[in-house]
Design a protein with these regions (language model features):
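Carbohydrate-interacting regions of secretory-pathway proteins
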Residues: 19-229
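Bacterial N-terminal signal peptides that target proteins for export
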Residues: 1-8
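Bacterial N-terminal signal peptides
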Residues: 8-17
Length: 229
């Protein structure tokens, strides 16, 4: 192997090592998304959803029923940046690593979106509140704004690491490899029975989804961007 080839191999190795290190570090701020791709096309031609449920008007995506909308594309490592607005009592979420859209609840990771000001969610376990990894990891703080105000959320999924930032604050950091049980979280708290697959066993790729009008209250999304990493 000549010197030029050796230098090229070493250079590539250092570059890959640097990228790997950078991806393992939680983002410090919301990203600049100018060149990122849309999560969904304005005409929803790249989405999977029941007819008549989801509408995209004036840049705002919302649902009339409790039905999710999915990307047609399968993603593994990625960053999603979006804005969401709750109504009174909203309970929604961003769904990652979904390998079964018909039975997504035990076959995906849900990043919770909720109106934490509503009594039913304020009094629920922390793992049900906005910014949680639903049923598994409570956010370190509640950063969601009151209903009717827009929030910004950035979700980074890199292999088994998941980072959730809301309104400039990192609220959840998860290493899925630590969730080896389907019954209890690493801190000893109970996992809801319908979340029957240990996160350590979940594939780290799949469709991305948004939960619809769950629990009777609407949810609104806009400026939804994605970057593969």
């Amino acid at each position: 192997m000549n010197k030029a080839v050796v230098l090229a191999v070493v250079g590539c190795s250092l570059l890959l090592s640097s990228c790997s290190r950078n991806l393992s570090v939680p983002p410090k701020t919301h990203p600049k998304v100018g060149s990122w791709n849309d999560l969904f096309a304005p005409d929803l031609s790249d989405a999977i959803y029941p007819d008549g449920v989801w509408t995209f008007e004036d840049g705002v995506l919302t649902a009339s029923k409790d039905e999710a909308i999915w990307t047609k594309k399968d993603y593994d490592n990625f960053v999603i940046d979006l804005e969401f607005k709750t109504a009174e009592g909203t309970n929604s979420g961003v769904i990652a690593y979904c390998t079964d859209m018909q039975n997504w609840i035990p076959n995906s990771v849900e990043i919770q979106i909720a109106d934490d000001f509503a009594e039913q969610w304020a009094n629920s376990p922390g793992t049900w509140q906005c910014g949680a990894i639903f049923g598994h990891l409570a956010p370190t703080k509640s950063m969601v704004k009151k209903p009717g105000e827009w929030n910004r959320m950035t979700i980074t999924c890199h292999d088994q690491m998941i980072y959730v930032m809301i309104n400039g604050e990192m609220v959840s950091v998860m290493n899925m490899a630590l969730w080896t049980s389907a019954k209890t979280n690493p801190d000893g708290s109970e996992i809801p029975s319908w979340l029957s697959t240990p996160f350590a066993e979940l594939p780290t790729h799949g469709n991305i989804g948004l939960q619809g009008k769950h629990a009777g209250a609407p949810i609104y999304f806009r400026n939804m961007k994605i970057k593969e990493i």
